[in-house]
Amino acid sequence: MKLLYTDIRTSLTEILTREAEELVAAGKRVFYIAPNSLSFEKERAVLECLSQQASFSITVTRFAQMARYLVLNDLPAKTTLDDIGLGLAFYKCLAELDPKDLRVYGAIKQDPQLIQQLIELYHEMTKSQMSFLDLENLTDEDKRADLLLIFEKVTAYLNQGQLAQGSQLSHLIEAIENDKVSSDFNQITLVIDGFTRFSAEEERVVDLLHGKGVEIVIGAYASKKAYTSPFSEGNLYQASVKFLHHLASKYQTPAQDCSQTHEKMDSFDKASRLLESSYDFSELALDVDEKDRENLQIWSCLTQKEELELVARSIRQKLHENSDLSYKHFRILLGDVASYQLSLKTIFDQYQIPFYLGRSEAMAHHPLTQFVESILALKRYRFRQEDLINLLRTDLYTDLSQSDIDAFEQYIRYLGINGLPAFQQIFTKSHHGKFNLERLNVLRLRILAPLETLFASRKQKAENLLQKWSVFLKEGAVTKQLQDLTTTLEAVEQERQAEVWKAFCHVLEQFATVFAGSQVSLEDFLALLHSGMSLSQYRTIPATVDTVLVQSYDLIAPLTADFVYAIGLTQDNLPKISQNTSLLTDEERQNLNQATEEGVQLLIASSENLKKNRYTMLSLVNSARKQLFLSAPSLFNESESKESAYLQELIHFGFRRREKRMNHKGLSKEDMGSYHSLLSSLVAYHQQGEMSDTEQDLTFVKVLSRVIGKKLDLQGLENPAIPTSPSSKTLAKDTLQALYPAKQEFYLSTSGLTEFYRNEYSYFLRYVLGLQEELRLRPDARSHGNFLHRIFERALQLPNEDSFDQRLEQAIQETSQEREFEAIYQESLEAQFTKEVLLDVARTTGHILRHNPAIETIKEEANFGGKDQAFIQLDNGRSVFVRGKVDRIDRLKANGAIGVVDYKSSLTQFQFPHFFNGLNSQLPTYLAALKREGKQNFFGAMYLEMAEPVQSLMAVKSLAGAVVEASKSMKYQGLFLEKESSYLGEFYNKNKANQLTDEEFQLLLDYNAYLYKKAAEKILAGRFAINPYTENGRSIAPYVQQHQAITGFEANYHLGQARFLKKLDLADGKRLVGEKLKQAWFEKIREELNR
């Protein structure tokens, strides 16, 4: 055993490589062992340090891979599972357990997160040389019972299936202990580099090999001062020093100091010594000069995007200044990889800098995983419509075009069908010939055929199920779709998709291994496949060696690259505080470590945090050979952040913080990096003058659209794709002639009028362009209203010989049997329940009709208007016609006065403010239309709410009181003529505010005609402004702004062009109610009509 240490500015790899070459010269075979995260990088570093640049006798590898290079004899032929296979095994065993058998984990026993944690615990216990039976020492009885039961079941299953347990390293340990290694240990040497601690498993391997006579050389970074200090707690080198002291004590071998004498202390050595003295409380006087500040720079940036742009510019500039440099001389370290990943690609592509981020990507969100998830959902939830749509949207199932998929989705949404039997029936329903049923049935068969074959599979052997799955992938054109999708991609993306496919196939291979010979149902297979894919990860390798490597800062080693940029070094990211997210708490780990024998040790992350983070900071400061840039943004993930305390310490030593900003106000030689980056800088430069006054704008895109829009306006140009504010064009004369020929009647409905005054452009979309809502065959508010209307229409038309209740029940029975309503309300249990609710509403509403002797109904569903009688005459002589349908016309028995009733599904009242602004013209329009047809004597126009009254029992003292209060809400709401009100009974809400004199009645009709005239003139002129109304002057109601995606209107930007409702001019603090409010609005109407 030979232990070495060196100062951090001397390359430990060079020293250990020389040791390795000397051992090779002595006839030894050398295994150069590096940590998992550094093994590939270390291989290149060792090759660069070798005098011959290569050696067949030196193998750079990891502890786990050593077994590959040693000859192991008489080992049982067991198949080794990786994490995917192990996850499948856990999933299977947990699925077989009854949730009641697990006291803690029963409810989440098949949750992917739990399975992932169980896998991690499995590996952790293997690495720590701990047996699962050691879990008996847990104090939590429920958790102990659950974990023991799970691991016992998984272990039994692995043994039964001849599947290897434990890691590759544990198999090597077992082979050495049982003398199953035939390799000559005297010819083997281990050189170990880059470790500051061994796991229990790694230490066991070193111990066994040392006992077999294998020569071992272990090196680490440490200063002589730290190594010889009697107190190392809190020292920067604490991790490596404790590691060396432990090994020296165990193997009775003092560590040798291999530090080199440097002619001059460089900037990074100076910073290291200052940091070390700060942490060991010793005094050290070193001056930091301008050269040091140039070599080790601390940047303070505003945002993460700005950081990346500054780094990209700096790299480009250095490459421009020195032709000997290449991309491989640069390294980028990230404080938080996930936060920078997307911006990194965008900005580095813009600056044309090739980079490689060596990070595994999860398959959980890949379309292939969503494809499997959708098929599982189809099987598990018995062919839900949404699951089939999700399957088609992956673009992996069948070779149908996007237009075919859209047409199929639209039709099945129209039908509202669920369940395989419903999809197996031939499509026959069409809405007035809107759908191409022949084509849709062809699509239905193409989509269903592969799924039907697959879903017909019964529980069978895993091998047979995999064959059927393979056939399904071919028949469903999944492999073909993947190939077609990748052919149009760039080479890098094609490689990425190839890795995804490999990962997918690997999950299937592991499934075949774990379930070989077992009977598996299709649903279990799909669930296992989805679980395996959710756990899977894939990664690509760089296409060329000459790239900028990007990695997390905590994986860095000293002297890694010439130029290193470490960004995102905020207080939250540096240092990284490891959190324990496993199934065992730190306290439980401590108890297990105390209860087990020596050498068996679970890692307690919190106890390692301080020494690990200090050593990481030391490695970070020494990661560069020439220049190091440490940066922290003021805004990190859109939240304010502070720079790391370690950076503040360096500033305290004399290094300077540099405020770095992207300057778009001028161009400099630093912008001459690449064509794309220069173009971007020019665009930003020309925008700067416009953008300087718009700091409140939320997004760059909105700012950009305004800037370009203004530029175009100045030059008399127009780009409809990026308007400065949403606007519409007046329709051309020939278009208007085609829409509204002079000889053809122009019709305007009351609903069209309301839509026009809500938002003129909404009227254009719905009534001119004919924009429709998506069709639905299932019952909706419209069908509910028609159903109730039909019941009352029929009930009131039946002869009076029978009681009203009998007539109502007969009407309910006959209406329910009509083909239209029978098809809708018998389709599903949900529809049947809806029908029962509607019938309750009908019976409740019938109460008003049953007990109202003062009136008689003379007409139901009465049509009004038409070409015979113009509603209004425009100034140009053109007539405007109004036609519609009144739900019911009543007549007072006393004097024959006419009243109009409109059924509503919710409480609706006539409101003068809304009427004045064109938003409540329904009742006046009905009265005006009937008056033009010759009716002269009216008692009113009103709404009847068709709903069950709801009464809070807390607000009344008794049930009788609740009945009284409920009856109050069941009244006709609307407008009534004052002279007829005495004839109306208790069912009419005839307070003074709702009663009109003859003069007020005529004024109401005249103003209503005025509203129609204004709207008709604008419509016939082809002018439709984008002007949704605002009631409070601050926002737009959602039902008013239904077409935002089309118009682009945003209330927070374009409120100025909204239509502000006209209101009464009241003195401050004055509030009118009742009849005074009515009189005030009539006064305003007179002003508007100049009367």
Curated annotation (Swiss-Prot):
GO MF term list: 5'-3' exonuclease activity; ATP binding; double-stranded DNA binding; helicase activity; hydrolase activity, acting on acid anhydrides
Gene3D superfamilies membership: P-loop containing nucleotide triphosphate hydrolases (3.40.50.300)
Biological process, per Gene Ontology: double-strand break repair via homologous recombination
InterPro entries in the record: ADDB_N (IPR049035), DNA_helicase_suRexB (IPR014141), P-loop_NTPase (IPR027417), PDDEXK_AddAB-type (IPR038726), Restrct_endonuc-II-like (IPR011335)
Keywords: ATP-binding, DNA damage, DNA repair, DNA-binding, Exonuclease, Helicase, Hydrolase, Nuclease, Nucleotide-binding
EC number from the UniProt entry: 3.1.-.-
Names of the cofactor(s): Mg(2+)
Other information: Despite having helicase-like domains, this subunit does not have helicase activity.
Binding partners and assembly: Heterodimer of AddA and RexB.
Function: The heterodimer acts as both an ATP-dependent DNA helicase and an ATP-dependent, dual-direction single-stranded exonuclease. Recognizes the chi site generating a DNA molecule suitable for the initiation of homologous recombination. This subunit has 5' -> 3' nuclease activity but not helicase activity.
Record-stated family: Belongs to the helicase family. AddB/RexB type 2 subfamily.
Protein name: ATP-dependent helicase/deoxyribonuclease subunit B
Top-level taxonomy: Bacteria, Bacillati, Bacillota, Bacilli, Lactobacillales
